[in-house]
Amino acid sequence: MKIVFLEPLGVSVDSIESARKILRDRGHEVIIYSDRIPELNKERASDADIVVESNMPLDKDFFDACPKLKMLSVAFTGLDHIDLEECKRRNITVMNSAGYSTQAVAEETICMMIGLYRHIVENDSITRKCCGKSIVPGREISGKTVGIIGMGAIGCRTATLAQAFGCKIIAWNRTPKHIDGVSFVEKDVLFKEADIIALHLALNEETRNFVTARELSMMKKDAIIINAARGPVINANDLSEALKNGKIAGAALDVYDNEPPLKEDNVLLSAPNTLLLPHIGFATKEAFELRLGIVVDNILKYLG
């Protein structure tokens, strides 16, 4: 079979060549592109049996251009950038890379909590303007109540890391669990009691707009919210209004309704007390190496 990697996946040359060898030794043709150019995806994958990609959108036009395609090994956790209905209609197997970024995203969540609490961006700006004595005092996360929404692998790992900082953990999950040191509460209770809210939900019709003006109005005025899950789980307009009106103290976001770069008219760009990142939670060297292994394993499982 012809296997096409539409991008190099952010790993070392040695790692990518090792992956190539594993697949070639089993008799497959392997093409690995050293750059990422979405406009060339259809041309590059036109005669592929198996395609590897991360988070570039793949729609009906792409699949029309790839009539031989049998399998997608997606180097990403979420699949909302892929037309899964079209894949189902064409009997294309789709496998994601669940679990590769658990530690990376959990660490980023803690980083964003501290970044907001300690006003890292503002104090960096003060220092660069050579007026370092005019500091913005911060707060400590130790002793604060962290409310985690979505207790999958990332949510659980975030809880463990937050506990190491001395935080109290409350959580909401669609299916209640028993986890030592974690108190599971109703959604409304979490929004009312948490000092810091961290979202770790998958995106589906139930979780789209999971956080709206209603939930934001329940939060403490000095509370902050972190979203390292999927952008549409928070209503961006409602969040922007809550920040502008001082209903909550801050928000840190790594995900948005659409992948960065953000458009100039995005309402979050003008919202105060925000820490905005360009969707980097998954992006560590360690996570990328683990991801490549999962991608190759998925291909081998498919091939039998």
What are these regions, as identified by a protein language model?
Residues 1-48:
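N-terminal glycine-/charge-rich "phosphate-binding" loop or analogous flexible N-terminal tail
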Residues 18, 135-221:
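Rossmann-like dinucleotide/phosphate-binding beta-alpha-beta segment
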Residues 34, 75-76, 92-103, 173, ...:
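Short beta->alpha connector loops at strand-helix junctions that form conserved
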Residues 48, 66, 193-194, 222:
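An anion/phosphate-binding loop that grips the pyrophosphate of nucleotide cofactors and donors
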Residues 54, 75, 200-203, 228:
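Short, well-ordered coil/turn residues at beta-beta hairpins
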Residues 57-69, 84-86, 206-225:
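Rossmann-fold NAD(P) dinucleotide-binding segment
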Residues 90-92, 98-145, 149, 160, ...:
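Phosphate-binding beta-alpha-beta segment of Rossmann-like dinucleotide-binding domains, i.e.
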Residues 94, 222-304:
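Rossmann-like dinucleotide-binding domain for NAD(H)/NADP(H)
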